[in-house]
Amino acid sequence: MAKNKIAYVCTECGGQSTKWQGQCPHCMTWNTMVESIIEASVPNRYASLTQTSELKKLNEVKMSAVYKRTTCISEFDRVLGGGFVPGGVVLIGGDPGIGKSTLLIQALSHMTNDKTQAACKVIYVSGEESPQQIAMRAKRLELEVSDIFILSEINLEKIIQSIEKNKPDVVVIDSIQTIYSEELQSAPGSVTQVRECSAQLTRIAKQLEVSMILVGHVTKEGSLAGPRVLEHIVDTVLYFEGDQNSSFRMVRAFKNRFGAVNELGVFAMTEKGLREVTNPSALFLSHHHEEVSGSCITVTQEGTRPLLIEIQALVDNAHGASPKRLGVGLEQNRLSMLLAVLHRHGGIACFDQDVFVNAVGGVKITEPGVDLAILCAIVS
């Protein structure tokens, strides 16, 4: 019998190395190599999981209209591209306590009680919370959850067996980092376990046309924990953003095969759960009774939605050898580049001044068209 071996696997690209290195030799990222057990090759391990497929011409493939099951939460449906697609796999990541489970239990409740759609059978697989905790949350939110089935299980084989037996329409896995397969000896949450469990759940979703929702953890840098290949396996990648000190939450689509990328949904956390914000521009603007310096309002495009956002800037004399460059919602390197452009082409030097830039509401600025508003706020 072949023995397992120890190797170092990159959490970003999944590349392997026989020894630890500070920089991944495959994708050149730093501090991403972690120790992992490489499973011994077992012949025909996945033979029972595959189905034979015949060769077909592309023009002979029968096409049918894609039916999207809406969540009855317009902001969430906007980010998803209209709703959940049968056979589609959605990955939702966010900080602990940001509201991922709350949003999903609200969406599932609306879907199972929506009389305008076909009946929806839902299985909520919880690997972190007990059924009692989930029931308490649903009661606190005053949700009707009589048609939602709870499965407290972290074994992949048992989860797949339950899905094949009950034939649900929607399955939620909370979270993918807690699931493990008996075929692998590594611990739950390891690179190997996350990759293989995600691949098998994706396979069963495509095979049975089940809408699969995977909840993922994020690292301290804000990226999804686990191998980068996880984001390539799924159809849609959503990030739950927001400040823990603020009641507002944002769901952003970073990848979507069935909708627009960079689409943004805005919510407000209340005692009764997440509430939609129908006018997000009001969130990203501060109200002044008179004109103030260091503020500029601009329009940015988030997916298919134009938004009004306010850029605030503060410039002060530096008291150290190296002036500070700090941007909230803006990358520091981008801010440094804009200050260099301002100095070179505008004749305004900030080399002896601290510069602080903030986007009201915590929105992340990615569109280059906002650069002019940033410079106007700094100059004013």
Language-model segments: residues:
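Conserved nucleotide-binding/hydrolysis micro-motifs of P-loop NTPases
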Residues: 32, 96-98, 128-132, 140-143, ...
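Conserved P-loop NTPase/AAA+ ATPase motor core
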Residues: 263-265, 271-380
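Short metal-coordination and nucleic-acid-contact micro-motifs, chiefly zinc-binding Cys/His arrays
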Residues: 4-6, 20
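Short Cys/His-rich micro-motifs in 6-15 aa windows
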Residues: 28-38
